């Protein structure tokens, strides 16, 4: 809202009003504002939750070999994250921007879904929370809405790469002069960096474009659901999900800025996406909220984000990647989320297969994979066999595991950005 106010005042040459037209100014201001809101509101939210005695009452001692006391810590801290994102975004962003609208809707939608899950766990004393099928329906629904909006909205357009020329020993990429609806997406490790969904559906003949858009919508649903669940699984140690997500947010912010700038888009040979600079503002709010939340969520945590936070965080990451046509980079950028999800799938499916044979065989000590690194041999199920029982040879403290996962995510983020120049 303030953006429109100061743009109006700029007509009357009010000193400083022109600064609001610069994306860098608004983005940095949003980051600072979000961080301060998160720090200020977080402290008060924690005190209020403790007064109301709203906290997790049941913790699994089998995955806490170091005896760190976790009972009595308030949860549903995702409320702090959501407020810290939305307030500065609404104040400082261009709220009529289609991409910003999609991000706000995603935040509210998945925030509400996660809130329902936490509410059932805490107030209904049901540790299972919202049934898995309802979570999936909620995630699929927002993925469908985002995919359909990007397909049908006249404002969601790109300017595709058109020509490649050599000038003074440098590659110069020219973009189409007209913005178009595009099914192209950036793909790493190939020469032209682009994959067209319609080309995959070329067997559909004259219907290949429509089929390509259907494939795009399906891909959007899969991305949003997968990343949202991956972030949810990653939220198992103090500061783990918030720290990893902050790093991912920085990488996505860089990708969004490059995609919104025709010069940088040409240099890196990727699609130029007009008006996507508002995603930079949103992602700066996201980063600020993560850092501010870490102030209280770092070990030993004073508050947990709960599903209110983790489902929302994953959805934000997935939708943002789809909007800037970088969803195929997520297996690298969100590698930690991917491994967390894969470990759970491997563990559950392998156990089911072996159980049919009358055996109780597990692959890992515990899943998600971060729990595998802190579980003692003495805490393992004596009736089960473990394929990787000796890995690791000793458990680690959760703060060490968290920091190592952060470092891994930083490396993966760097690799993701490097892929833009690898061709």
Q: What kind of region is each of these model predictions?
A:
Residues 59-73, 127-138:
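Juxtamembrane helix-capping/reentrant segments at transmembrane boundaries
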Residues 2-44, 83-112, 144-185, 208, ...:
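Alpha-helical transmembrane segments
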Residues 18, 121-131:
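Membrane interface segments of multi-pass transport proteins and intramembrane proteases
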Residues 43-61:
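Membrane-interface helix-loop junction between the first two transmembrane segments
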Residues 55-65, 263-268:
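Non-transmembrane, extramembrane segments of multi-pass ion/lipid transporters
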Residues 190-212:
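Short, aromatic-rich amphipathic segments at membrane interfaces
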């Amino acid at each position: 809202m303030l953006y429109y106010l100061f743009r109006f005042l700029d007509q009357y040459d009010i000193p400083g009003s022109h600064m609001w037209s610069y994306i860098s100014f608004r983005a940095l201001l949003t980051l600072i504002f979000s961080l301060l809101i998160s720090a200020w509101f977080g402290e008060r939210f924690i005190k209020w939750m403790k007064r109301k005695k709203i906290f997790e009452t049941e913790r699994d001692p089998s995955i806490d070999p170091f005896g760190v006391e976790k009972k009595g810590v308030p949860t549903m801290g995702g409320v702090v994250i959501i407020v810290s994102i939305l307030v500065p975004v609404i104040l400082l962003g261009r709220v009529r921007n289609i991409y910003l609208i999609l991000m706000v809707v995603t935040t509210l939608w998945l925030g509400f879904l996660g809130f329902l899950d936490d509410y059932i766990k805490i107030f209904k004393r049901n540790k299972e929370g919202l049934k898995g099928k309802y979570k999936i329906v909620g995630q699929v629904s927002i993925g469908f809405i985002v995919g359909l909006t990007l397909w049908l909205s006249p404002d969601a357009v790109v300017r595709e790469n058109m020509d490649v020329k050599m000038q003074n020993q440098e590659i110069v990429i020219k973009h189409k002069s007209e913005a178009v609806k595009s099914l192209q997406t950036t793909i790493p490790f190939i020469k032209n960096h682009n994959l067209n969904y319609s080309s995959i559906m070329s067997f559909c003949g004259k219907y290949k474009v429509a089929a390509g858009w259907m494939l795009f919508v399906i891909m959007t649903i899969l991305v949003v659901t997968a990343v949202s669940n991956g972030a949810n699984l990653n939220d198992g140690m103090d500061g783990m999900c918030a720290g990893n997500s902050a790093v991912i947010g920085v990488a996505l912010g860089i990708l969004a800025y490059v995609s919104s700038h025709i010069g940088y888009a040409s240099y890196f040979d990727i699609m130029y996406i007009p008006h996507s600079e508002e995603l930079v503002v949103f992602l700066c709010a996201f980063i600020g909220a993560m850092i501010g939340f870490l102030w209280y969520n770092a070990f030993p945590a004073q508050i947990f984000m709960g599903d209110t936070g983790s489902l929302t965080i994953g959805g934000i990451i997935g939708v943002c990647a789809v909007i800037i046509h970088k969803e195929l980079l997520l297996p690298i950028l969100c590698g930690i989320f991917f491994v967390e999800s894969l470990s759970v799938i491997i563990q559950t499916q392998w156990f089911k297969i072996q159980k049919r044979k009358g055996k109780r065989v597990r692959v890992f000590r515990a899943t998600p994979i971060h729990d595998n690194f802190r579980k003692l041999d003495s805490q393992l199920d004596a009736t089960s066999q473990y394929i990787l029982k000796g890995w690791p040879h000793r458990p680690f403290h959760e703060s060490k595991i968290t920091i190592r996962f952060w470092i891994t995510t930083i490396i993966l983020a760097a690799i993701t950005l490097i892929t833009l120049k690898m061709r």
